[in-house]
Amino acid sequence: MEGLKVTPLRGVYEEYGGKIVDFAGYELPTQFKGFLHEHHTVREKAGLFDVSHMGEAMVTGKDAGKFIQYLMTNDINVLKDNEVLYTFMCNEDGGVIDDLLVYKFAEDEFFLVINASNKDKDVKWIMDHKGDFDVEIADVSDSIAQLALQGPLAEEILQKIVDVDLQEIKFFKLRRDVLVDGKKCLVSRTGYTGEDGFEIYCKPEDAKGLWHAILNAGKEEGAQPIGLGARDTLRFEASLLLYGNEMDETITPLEVGMGFFVKLKVEEDFIGKDALIKQKAEGVTRKLVGFELIDKGIPRHGYEVIKDGKVIGHVTTGYKSPTLNKAIGLALVEEQYSKIGTEFNIKVRKKELKAVAIDKRFYTKKTKTK
């Protein structure tokens, strides 16, 4: 695939039967043994993902915390060292520039993990808003590889090849300088599947060795490599949002039900705060809802949502859920049609299929916090 970027793991995909596609300008595996098999493997055992296409940036300096707070909707002040926070970075209108993870290493040292498709845009946005803040900003994406081991057996498997007690790394906490198969890594208890799991950040030259070491450690437990197809169905069932589907620069966090991550009462100003305060006071005019198709069919991204002959929104993500065995989806619709139990139609290939609004938390699994 000419002109596409590759991750440090590009050479190992074919060893495991990987089928390669263009994703966010990268050659990445969409599946290995089939996305249904891979989906169930993560729900029941554990799966290993190459997520080295994600972007990373370091923000350091005396004003690092203040600067991060100015960029983000969540309350950065609550973060202690070695903790992780999910947040949005918005424009002045409250539209989402990106959703990302903020890792706090120290008062003057923060690590940002950003979506692959937004890497260049995000780094430019951050640099453009530096102003008089005493900070240094560095795009470190090319010097880091990232693996994700996800599933109920993730801890058991990874514990075999690390030098720390993984039970000490709680949900949304991190540990630096963990030896994973003898290689220094950053390990956080985070993920994008709705399961327990870890994200492992390493040097690019260590990625292949760690990939093999983790899969070998999980052989008995049935660990498998997982592609992008299952990554999307897993995050979707857990109602984890995808930039470009559920969010973009014209959609606010409040419209997609993510107000918990928008702290309007923080003392400090942040970009988009005024617009979001106004939107909260006036009420949103559209909302993200879950739905189930009553008629037979599969909803897909972009399909129209119709009520009484009028288009009231669109499907943001839709699948036949591998776990629930139902055709379900997420849709951004006019607020008055967002109540659970509301019936509407989804236009699937020129046919209008009946659907009903349901709780968008399709799948929940208790994350280990012990």
Curated annotation (Swiss-Prot):
Gene name in the database record: gcvT
GO CC field: cytosol; glycine cleavage complex
Physiological role: The glycine cleavage system catalyzes the degradation of glycine.
Subunit structure: The glycine cleavage system is composed of four proteins: P, T, L and H.
PANTHER family listed in its UniProt record: AMINOMETHYLTRANSFERASE, AMINOMETHYLTRANSFERASE, MITOCHONDRIAL
Organism: Clostridium botulinum (strain Loch Maree / Type A3)
Top-rank lineage group of the source organism: Bacteria
Protein name: Aminomethyltransferase
Key words of the record: Aminotransferase, Transferase
Family: Belongs to the GcvT family.
GO MF annotation, one: aminomethyltransferase activity
Reactions accelerated catalytically: N(6)-[(R)-S(8)-aminomethyldihydrolipoyl]-L-lysyl-[protein] + (6S)-5,6,7,8-tetrahydrofolate = N(6)-[(R)-dihydrolipoyl]-L-lysyl-[protein] + (6R)-5,10-methylene-5,6,7,8-tetrahydrofolate + NH4(+)
Biological processes annotated in GO: glycine decarboxylation via glycine cleavage system
Enzyme Commission no: 2.1.2.10
InterPro entries referenced in this protein's UniProt entry, alphabetically: GCS_T (IPR006223), GCS_T_bac (IPR022903), GCST_C (IPR013977), GCV_T_N (IPR006222), GcvT/YgfZ/DmdA (IPR028896), GcvT/YgfZ_C (IPR029043), TrmE/GcvT_dom1 (IPR027266)
